[in-house]
Amino acid sequence: MSAQVSLELHHRISQFLFHEASLLDDWKFRDWLAQLDEEIRYTMRTTVNAQTRDRRKGVQPPTTWIFNDTKDQLERRIARLETGMAWAEEPPSRTRHLISNCQVSETDIPNVFAVRVNYLLYRAQKERDETFYVGTRFDKVRRLEDDNWRLLERDIVLDQAVITSHNLSVLF
C-alpha cells in the first residue's frame, strides 16, 4: 500500500463502510446497491492451503472463483432475494457484519482509496443454524464530488478453506 491518509479521511471511509455493513444487516439491499460504483468488481475465490516451502518460493496453488460479480449480477442476486423464492433465505438470515483493523491508503488514481479490513460475518438462520465467516476484505472506494462514497472493488478472502455453511447467499 502507498501513502497513508489523514485521520479525518480515514474516519470518513470507515463510517462509509460501517454504514454499508448496517444496510446489509438490515436487509436494505436496494440502498446498499446505491453505494456501489457502476464499475464494481465483487469477488471471492476459494482458499487453498499452501505448504510453507511453496509459499517461500512464491508458489500459490490455483484457486477458482466462488463469485466474480458485476453490479448487474449483484442486482440480479438481490432481485431474487426480493421475490421470496430464494429458498436458501427462507426464513431470512439474520446477519452481523463486524469490520475492524481498517487500513486506508492512497492509490495512483485520484479520489480512489485502497482499504483493507478484517471482517467477521455472523449468520443465524432458523433455530440452530449459525455460521461464522472470517477473513480479510480488500476494497477500493471512490470519493465523489459531493463527498459521498462508492464501493469500486471488493475482494473477499476467507480464512476458511472449507465452507461449512449450506450456501453463500449472504453479501459480504
From Swiss-Prot:
Pathway(s) served: Aromatic compound metabolism; 3-phenylpropanoate degradation
UniProt key word Oxidoreductase: yes
Oxidoreductase is among the record's keywords: yes
Subunit-structure text: This dioxygenase system consists of four proteins: the two subunits of the hydroxylase component (HcaE and HcaF), a ferredoxin (HcaC) and a ferredoxin reductase (HcaD).
Function per UniProt: Part of the multicomponent 3-phenylpropionate dioxygenase. Converts 3-phenylpropionic acid (PP) and cinnamic acid (CI) into 3-phenylpropionate-dihydrodiol (PP-dihydrodiol) and cinnamic acid-dihydrodiol (CI-dihydrodiol), respectively.
Family, as annotated: Belongs to the bacterial ring-hydroxylating dioxygenase beta subunit family.
Name of protein: 3-phenylpropionate/cinnamic acid dioxygenase subunit beta
Species per Swiss-Prot/TrEMBL record: Shigella flexneri
Gene that this sequence comes from: hcaF
